[in-house]
Amino acid sequence: PLFDKRQRCCNGRRGCSSRWCRDHSRCCGRR
């Protein structure tokens, strides 16, 4: 689900370059 998608943003550094990850994942910028 959505949580898994966010978690994947956190795990991969590449994920953080995606704008969706930066907007929705706490690990990637938005705190």
UniProtKB/Swiss-Prot annotation:
InterPro entries: Conotoxin_mu-typ. It is found in: Secreted. The keyword ATP-binding does not apply. One of its GO terms (cellular component) is extracellular region. The keyword Oxidoreductase does not apply. Keywords: Amidation, Cleavage on pair of basic residues, Disulfide bond, Ion channel impairing toxin, Neurotoxin, Pyrrolidone carboxylic acid, Secreted, Toxin, Voltage-gated sodium channel impairing toxin. Disulfide bonds join 9-21, 10-27, 16-28. SmIIIA' is a putative isoform where the N-terminal AA is missing. GO terms for molecular function: sodium channel inhibitor activity; toxin activity. Its main location: secreted. The modification Pyrrolidone carboxylic acid is found at residue 7. The modification Cysteine amide is found at residue 28. Transmembrane segments: none annotated. Expressed by the venom duct. Residues 1-6 form a propeptide. All peptide bonds in this toxin adopt the trans conformation. Negative results: does not show activity on rNav1.8/SCN10A (IC(50) is >10 uM). Belongs to the conotoxin M superfamily. The cysteine framework is III (CC-C-C-CC). Mu-conotoxins block voltage-gated sodium channels (Nav). This toxin blocks rNav1.5/SCN5A (IC(50) is 1.3 uM), rNav1.6/SCN8A (IC(50) is 160 nM), rNav1.7/SCN9A (IC(50) is 1.3 uM), rNav1.1/SCN1A (K(d) is 3.8 nM), rNav1.2/SCN2A (K(d) is 1.3 nM), rNav1.4/SCN4A (K(d) is 0.22 nM), rNav1.6/SCN8A (K(d) is 69 nM), and rNav1.7/SCN9A (K(d) is 260 nM). This toxin is very potent but weakly discriminating among sodium channels. The block of these channels is modified when beta-subunits are coexpressed with alpha subunits. This is Mu-conotoxin SmIIIA. It comes from Conus stercusmuscarum.
